[in-house]
Every structure is written in structure tokens, then in C-alpha cells.
Amino acid sequence: MIGDFVDEVNIKVIAGKGGDGAVSFRREKFVEKGGPDGGDGGDGGSIIIKSTLNKNTLVDFKYKKIFRAENGENGKNKNKAGKAGEDVLIEVPVGTCIYDLETNELLSDLKAPQQYLVVARGGKGGRGNARFATSTLQVPRIAEKGVEGEVKNLKLILKIVADVGLIGYPNVGKSTLISRISNAKVEIADYPFTTIVPNLGVVKVDTDYSFVVADIPGLIEGAHLGKGLGDQFLRHIERCSVLVHLIDISCFERDDPVEDYINIRKELESFSHILLKKKEIIVANKIDAVDKDTLEKRLTDFKNRTGKDIFPISAYTGENIQELITMVWSHISKEKIEQQKFFQKRLKSNVTEKIKIQPVNYEPDPFIKINVVKLDNETFEVVGDGIEKLLSRYDIHQKDSRLLILNTLEKNGLNKILRNAGVKEGDTVYIGNFSFEYIP
């Protein structure tokens, strides 16, 4: 049984900012200021989500919902680059779907072990002043700031990866059956909704092969609308190759097995048409609780009214259980053998060591749309998305950075735009948190 079962959570991931480039100069005789030797900033750490077979619930995320990667270190003198920020690896159960919480877009469905998704990339480290030295600018007092890392709000939804789903009304014997055929240790009692979370069990076919069975908590009419235990567990049978539909043939608690069967099929259809297309094995449980003649009449009645075969078993005594396992395996064996070979191959490789992540980078656009906002009769502010991005990369309080910013803006017609906006000589103009007196 899955202890504290959680199958849907929201988390926030914050990748690391790139480190700032350094402005420094080496000590060298007869060389002004010694020449630039500021190193680059390190890239910010990224955040990666990877699937693992070692987890079967999202319960960890009830207590930790925000994940931050390290920022990159700032560059240093002597052309030493800052250290890159450490990546954060988040492990989730196989079967986890990752959605963008803002757009509801499915980003990835981690259906196999060792699959991964980079959910937030770290920012690129800024270049140090050694990178800006030219024949005309031999003593550059300019360096780039690191780029901010990505920030994402995500929804994680777990859909259990099981080969076989046990479905049926509460108290038809699903928990007894899964405990009989697998290694699952489950709570069994004679009242509805004993099972309130999915139980998983591994059924050994032989020494080489096995398959996973999920005991889905009992369904009732209106489950797709949230009645009973609701539709919260219906998603867990979407991945199953085969549905084993248990019917209580004893009629001890429920009067009509056929009506029960039809009602559950309607619930599956209301939730998803895909569920109706899955292979279904109908099983009449609790045959030990009725005499032979009554059993034959009820099995015949079921066949006549539904047109479908029904296989009799007793989960309690074990009668016909091995035959049921053989029947299930015959339907899933080919697909399962290929899947297990694929899983074993993936488990032999540590894929996260091979991940190459391109950090978030921003090269200022040479073509910037400039807007001027009048704050009062003598004060104006230069604004625009391109300007904000430009200011995010360079420190306008550094002389050479300021010249680079102003030259870029002038190439985009800053003076003309200021004049057309009514800016006069002596007025104050703000660019970010830097201000200057306007002189045409």
C-alpha cells in the first residue's frame, strides 16, 4: 500500500542567476592600470526533474514546494571565472506529468525511469572587462551583469504506471485479490472504502518476468463527478493495458451484478472514452459464497444480458487464481517484455550526467524602441522593454558601461526623440536609476 498517498501538487522552481563579470586590472610594469583581467561570472544553476522507480507518491512536495538553484559566482581578477551554480535535481515517481501552471501546457510525461526535463534554466554569467578590451578601448571599465535564471510555477500530476488495473464497486474483493496474487500488503475489511488510496502489487509470472497491478479504490455511480472517492483515482487506470473488472457474484451486499457492471462502465466512459477501449477481463469473485447451481444461473444471466464472458474465481480460497494470472499475462506479455528490456537499459545509464544545459542568455538588441515619459515640467524618463534589458546587463554607474548604453540609445535616435518629447536644455532625464542634465 502507498502510505501517505499524494498524486497532485504545485511547486515553484527558481533557477540561479548568472554571476556578474569582474572589472579588474593586472599589475604590469609600463602598462596603464596593468591591463584588464576581469573574469567572467559563472552560469546559474538549473533545475531538473527526473523520474525514478524509488518513489511512488508525490508526498515529499507537501512539505517542500519551492526549489532554488545556486547563483553563479561573480568573476574574479587574474581572468578567473566564477564557479557555476549547482544544479538541483528533483526526483519524482515514474508516471509523473509536468504541467506549466500558468498555461496548463503539458511539458513532459515521464513514463519511464531515468527520463528528465530541465524545467528552469540558469542564467548566463556576465563577461568580465577582459572581454571588452579593443585597440581603442584598452582600459575598459565595463563588465556584464549575469542573466536572471528562469522562474516557473509547475503542477505535478502522478498517474500510476501499472500494467493491470483492478476496478469495481467497493467491497467486491479487489484488496483480497491483489494480496492473493502479488506481494502487496493491504488492509482488508468487510466494509466499503476500506481502500482509500491505490494499492500496488507486483505479480511474478516466472523468474524473469512480472507485471504491476493497481487496486483502484472502489468506484460508485457519480464517481466522475466527485462522488464517493470521486474521480481523483480514475486517472490512475489511464495507463493500464488491461482492466480486470471485479463483480461480486455472491449478491450478498448488492442485488444485481449486471447493473453494477453497467454502472461502472458508464463511469469510465464519463471520465474518458479511452478507458472503454482498453482490454477488459470481467471476473466474478466470491464464488465460494454461493452454491454451484446458483453460480451457474448467475453466470449465465450475466452472459445473456451483457453478451460478455465472465471468469469465476474466489480471491478468498484461491480458486482459479493462477488461471486468471495466466489469462492476464497472455494479453500483456509482448508489450511488457519489451518494456522491461527498455527499462533495464535505461537503468544501466545515468542520463543526468550527460545533460548539457544551455543557460538563459540575453544579447541586447541593437534596435531599441524608445519612449519618453514626462514626470513633471522639467523631468523626463526614458523607458522601454529594450532599455530595461540593456540596463539588466550593464551597470550604468560604470563610466564605460554608461557610454555603451548611451551610444546604443543614440544610435536609435535618443536625442531626436527627447527633443520631440519637449525636453529642453537643463531638464533632468532619467534612464533607470541614473539621471543626467540634458544638453542638446
UniProtKB/Swiss-Prot annotation:
Residue sites binding GTP per the record: 168-175, 193-197, 215-218, 285-288, 314-316
GO-annotated molecular function: GTP binding; GTPase activity; magnesium ion binding
Family the UniProt entry places it in: Belongs to the TRAFAC class OBG-HflX-like GTPase superfamily. OBG GTPase family.
Domain OBG-type G: 162-333
Name this polypeptide is given: GTPase Obg
Classification of source organism: Bacteria, Thermotogati, Thermotogota, Thermotogae, Petrotogales
Entries under CDD domains matching the protein: Obg
EC number: 3.6.5.-
Annotated source species: Petrotoga mobilis (strain DSM 10674 / SJ95)
PANTHER family: DEVELOPMENTALLY REGULATED GTP-BINDING PROTEIN-RELATED (PTHR11702), MITOCHONDRIAL RIBOSOME-ASSOCIATED GTPASE 2 (PTHR11702:SF31)
Annotated residues for binding of Mg(2+): 175, 195
UniProtKB keywords: Cytoplasm, GTP-binding, Hydrolase, Magnesium, Metal-binding, Nucleotide-binding
GO cellular component, one term: cytoplasm
Gene that this sequence comes from: obg
Subcellular location: Cytoplasm
